[in-house]
Amino acid sequence: MALTKEDILNAIAEMPVMDLVELIEAAEEKFGVTATAAVAAAAPAAGGEAAAEQTEFDVVLTSFGGNKVAVIKAVRGATGLGLKEAKEVVEAAPKAIKEGVAKEEAEELKKTLEEAGAEVELK
């Protein structure tokens, strides 16, 4: 007999928290996805009006990851800072790289920094 969605949800509801964490990690590995991406995608739906009203964003570097040199180069290119200043900004993470920028520019900068290996948040 095949399991229904209801059966699966009931089984998950009865699982201890640590088992749920392991289940999520196994699902992420098996399907090549991350739960944080799903949560981030669902968040605007929950607060749709508030998210739609925001027009200016702060691009915040939360971590430079494993490739500090590439992140410094990306910060220099995006901000026009000198090498020393860009290095100081990157090493001071978490730190705002740009503040009060349009959504499109903020997303483009986030993409550039993430491609360089950084972890970035838009606020």
Swiss-Prot record:
Molecular function terms from GO? mRNA binding; structural constituent of ribosome
Pfam families recorded for this chain? Ribosomal_L12 (PF00542), Ribosomal_L12_N (PF16320)
Going by the UniProt record, its keywords in alphabetical order are: Ribonucleoprotein, Ribosomal protein
User: Among its keywords, does the record have Magnesium?
Assistant: no
Task: Tell me which InterPro entries the record gives.
Answer: Ribosomal_bL12, Ribosomal_bL12_C, Ribosomal_bL12_C/ClpS-like, Ribosomal_bL12_oligo, Ribosomal_bL12_oligo_N_sf
- Extract one GO cellular component term from the record: cytosolic large ribosomal subunit
Name a single GO biological process: translation
> Tell me, how does this one assemble?
Homodimer. Part of the ribosomal stalk of the 50S ribosomal subunit. Forms a multimeric L10(L12)X complex, where L10 forms an elongated spine to which 2 to 4 L12 dimers bind in a sequential fashion. Binds GTP-bound translation factors.
User: Which family does the similarity line name?
Assistant: Belongs to the bacterial ribosomal protein bL12 family.
Function, please?
Answer: Forms part of the ribosomal stalk which helps the ribosome interact with GTP-bound translation factors. Is thus essential for accurate translation.
The protein depicted here goes by the name Large ribosomal subunit protein bL12
Q: Which organism is it from?
A: Pseudoalteromonas atlantica (strain T6c / ATCC BAA-1087)
What taxonomic classification does the UniProt entry list for its organism?
Bacteria, Pseudomonadati, Pseudomonadota, Gammaproteobacteria, Alteromonadales
